[in-house]
Amino acid sequence: MQENRPVIALDFPEFSDVKDFLEKFDPSEKLYIKLGMELFYTAGPQVVYYVKSLGHSVFLDLKLHDIPNTVESSMRVLARLGVDMVNVHAAGGVEMMVAAKRGLEAGTPIGRQRPKLIAVTQLTSTSEEIMQNDQKIMTSLEESVINYAQKTAQAGLDGVVCSAHEVEKIKAATSKEFICLTPGIRPEGASKGDQKRVMTPKEARTIGSDYIVVGRPITQAKDPVSAYHAIKEEWNQ
């Protein structure tokens, strides 16, 4: 099922930046917010509690990648924060991903729904050249992504983070219900920034993405609210 709200990546360095940004929106409008490493390492759980207190959904983007026991324990803690989605690196392996889900289930308070758990396949900043030269994965980028997606499904996770260009083949290799969350989304004419594999909101919708993540085209816009609504409208066409 496709989420009708673009996920806004609040890649800010300070808690105060989050407050300033969210205050621009009408309090009645409920957003889907991605909180990343820098912000969480700076502000800690309080930034999650604050965003949730305003009624917004939270994707806590920490990309856990460690030994299974450590990831399981960490997920047990993150589940208590009330977030709606968390992620791990698929490169950690099936055992680690299974442990992550187990920890998430154990930590979710009674009466609450377990946060969705997705895995990163290859970062959208990774090119095939980088993958082959630096990671020494001597297949195509697409084959690597699909392999990671299949391992993620095997582990029982809800979906993956992937480029919109890979959505159709990932769903064919897993299932239609398997979530594909796609960063690297840019409105027509926007700068690609450090993203190597990008797509517009309309293209991502057409190709079957379930969630899209948009950061700088919204957060660095002169009018972030208008920019968000324009992207949301394009996403829901």
From Swiss-Prot:
Stretches assigned to coiled coil: none
EC number of this enzyme: 4.1.1.23
Catalytic activity: orotidine 5'-phosphate + H(+) = UMP + CO2
Amino acids binding substrate: 11, 34, 61-70, 124, 186, 195, 215-216
Enzyme class label: lyase
PROSITE patterns hit by this protein: OMPDECASE
Transmembrane segments: none
Alphabetical list of CDD domains matching this protein: OMP_decarboxylase_like
GO molecular-function terms, A-Z: orotidine-5'-phosphate decarboxylase activity
One GO BP: 'de novo' pyrimidine nucleobase biosynthetic process
SMART domains: OMPdecase
Record flagged with keyword Ion transport: no
Active site, renumbered: K63 (proton donor)
Entries under Pfam families matching the protein: OMPdecase
Pathway: Pyrimidine metabolism; UMP biosynthesis via de novo pathway; UMP from orotate: step 2/2
One Gene Ontology term, aspect cellular component: cytosol
Keywords, ordered alphabetically: Decarboxylase, Lyase, Pyrimidine biosynthesis
Family as reported in the entry's similarity comment: Belongs to the OMP decarboxylase family. Type 1 subfamily.
Subunit structure: Homodimer.
Functional note: Catalyzes the decarboxylation of orotidine 5'-monophosphate (OMP) to uridine 5'-monophosphate (UMP).
NCBIfam families tied to this protein: PRK00230.1 (NF001273), pyrF (TIGR01740)
Name by which UniProt lists this protein: Orotidine 5'-phosphate decarboxylase
